[in-house]
């Protein structure tokens, strides 16, 4: 094992995560229908600051992410600062790393803390699948640019006459990888076939996720980390994730048809994450700054790792690549973990990564490591359910996982937890957290 890389400031301060919060997550076009991501971000950051009672000027930086970009608000982070009553001089910028976006936001704030340029910051992300940037065809876009430069009505009419009826149709956001043309579900199907993952195994994992999430809500474990939201017309509060199927049975999952490979596939809408709206954020500080403000941290960031692999085959293997690196940098092994939380983009993707984490062959032949990262104990794995149940607002999921894992570690008396996710473009992310 290589030498650990401690995440501390020049003064030896650890990176503390003092609090975290999220909105309830809503299926596309339900509770947050018509609410843009920037407003969801304002909701969660405003409430997080109000609950923490931290002086507004104590937050020196806000790093926020959004995957489904809205042209009218390209820097969502700055809009959140301006829309929540934060100090107008607060540094704010936006990041995007697909499904690992808020992992990146947390890493960026942590690096600012370690560099000594700030002592406290907020990281998070928000996405809306209900408010989408509907575009126009390339032909219409080109004509509109040319029309804007045309000098006469005749020139404008000539330009418009080149268009066909189909050129006027709206163009929804792309759901496929730009470089390959493959949808995420196509990659999940690849992985199911490559690693021999059956439909029954996928449905069982999805069912487990929903059952665990429903139980977590029923036992009140999520109440402290999920805010109550009010949206127009402000008649009813929205308080809980609305995708969780607590009363479903395995027989219900078996009824669904494959969603991507219609003839021979095994990936369905039920064993995949749904399109979701929501936001999540965490406050990070140096350990000494938290003490100055009289705050007890939820926990500490022990290490993180980001990886990238080829996109043409089985590209959602980010956790299998980033997990050993994050553990190594933390000076830990899989056996040292109290909790292991993996983003469930698809049941097939999740099961494939779990399989490879325990594979000696994958470790030697692909990662170039002497031994496997280690089998993941089912008693430690996604103990409160995962993204298949909660939903997946792309940029918010990492912050949800971090907050949820730290709260659960505290309930268990402390320990180490690892959170990890795959992401579009063959990217992966993992973070090791510590709670006392």
UniProtKB/Swiss-Prot annotation:
Active site: 99 (acyl-thioester intermediate), 392 (proton acceptor), 422 (proton acceptor)
Cellular component terms (Gene Ontology): cytosol
Matches recorded under Gene3D superfamilies: 3.40.47.10
Record flagged with keyword Acyltransferase: yes
EC numbers for this chain: 2.3.1.16
Keywords for the protein's UniProt record, in alphabetical order: Acyltransferase, Cytoplasm, Fatty acid metabolism, Lipid degradation, Lipid metabolism, Transferase
Any Gene Ontology biological process: fatty acid beta-oxidation
Keyword Hydrolase belongs to the record: no
GO molecular function: acetyl-CoA C-acyltransferase activity
Catalyzed reaction equations: an acyl-CoA + acetyl-CoA = a 3-oxoacyl-CoA + CoA
Subcellular location: Cytoplasm
Pfam families documented for this protein: Thiolase_C, Thiolase_N
Family that this chain belongs to: Belongs to the thiolase-like superfamily. Thiolase family.
Subunit architecture: Heterotetramer of two alpha chains (FadJ) and two beta chains (FadI).
Function: Catalyzes the final step of fatty acid oxidation in which acetyl-CoA is released and the CoA ester of a fatty acid two carbons shorter is formed.
Entry protein name: 3-ketoacyl-CoA thiolase
Organism lineage: Bacteria, Pseudomonadati, Pseudomonadota, Gammaproteobacteria, Enterobacterales
Record gene name: fadI
């Amino acid at each position: 094992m290589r030498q650990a890389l401690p995440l501390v400031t020049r003064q030896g301060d650890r990176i503390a995560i003092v609090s975290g919060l999220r909105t309830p997550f809503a299926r596309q076009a339900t509770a947050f229908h018509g609410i843009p991501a920037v407003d969801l971000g304002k909701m969660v950051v405003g409430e997080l600051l109000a609950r923490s009672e931290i002086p507004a000027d104590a937050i020196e930086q806000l790093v926020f992410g959004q995957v489904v970009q809205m042209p009218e608000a390209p820097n969502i982070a700055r809009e959140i600062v301006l829309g929540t009553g934060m100090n107008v001089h607060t540094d704010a910028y936006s990041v995007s790393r697909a499904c690992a976006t808020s992992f990146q936001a947390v890493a960026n704030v942590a690096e600012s803390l370690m560099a000594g340029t700030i002592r406290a910051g907020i990281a998070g992300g928000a996405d809306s699948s209900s408010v989408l940037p509907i575009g126009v065809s390339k032909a219409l876009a080109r004509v509109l640019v040319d029309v804007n430069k045309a000098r006469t009505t005749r020139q404008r009419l000539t330009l418009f006459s080149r268009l066909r009826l189909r050129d006027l149709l709206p163009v929804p956001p792309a759901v496929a990888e730009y470089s390959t043309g493959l949808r995420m579900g196509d990659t999940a199907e690849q992985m199911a076939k490559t690693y021999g993952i059956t439909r029954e195994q996928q449905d069982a994992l999805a069912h487990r996720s929903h059952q665990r999430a429903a139980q977590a809500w029923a036992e009140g474990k999520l109440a402290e980390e999920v805010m109550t939201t009010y949206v127009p017309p402000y008649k009813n509060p929205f308080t809980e994730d609305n995708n969780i199927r607590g009363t479903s049975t395995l027989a219900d999952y078996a009824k669904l048809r494959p969603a991507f490979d219609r003839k021979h596939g095994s990936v369905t809408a039920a064993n995949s994450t749904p399109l979701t709206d929501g936001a999540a954020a965490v406050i990070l500080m140096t350990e000494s700054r938290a003490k100055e403000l009289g705050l007890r941290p939820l926990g500490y960031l022990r290490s993180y790792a980001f990886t990238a692999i080829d996109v043409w085959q089985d590209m959602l293997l980010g956790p299998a690549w980033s997990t050993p690196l994050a553990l190594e940098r933390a000076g830990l092994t899989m056996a040292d973990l109290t909790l292991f939380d993996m983003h469930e983009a698809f049941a097939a993707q999740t099961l494939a990564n779990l399989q490879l984490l325990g594979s000696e062959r994958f470790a030697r032949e692909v990662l170039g490591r002497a031994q496997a990262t280690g089998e993941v104990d089912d008693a430690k794995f996604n103990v409160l359910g995962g993204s298949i149940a909660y939903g997946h607002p792309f940029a918010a999921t990492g912050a949800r996982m971090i907050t949820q894992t730290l709260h659960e570690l505290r309930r268990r008396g402390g320990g180490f937890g690892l959170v990890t996710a795959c992401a579009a473009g063959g990217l992966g992310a993992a973070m090791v957290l510590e709670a006392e």
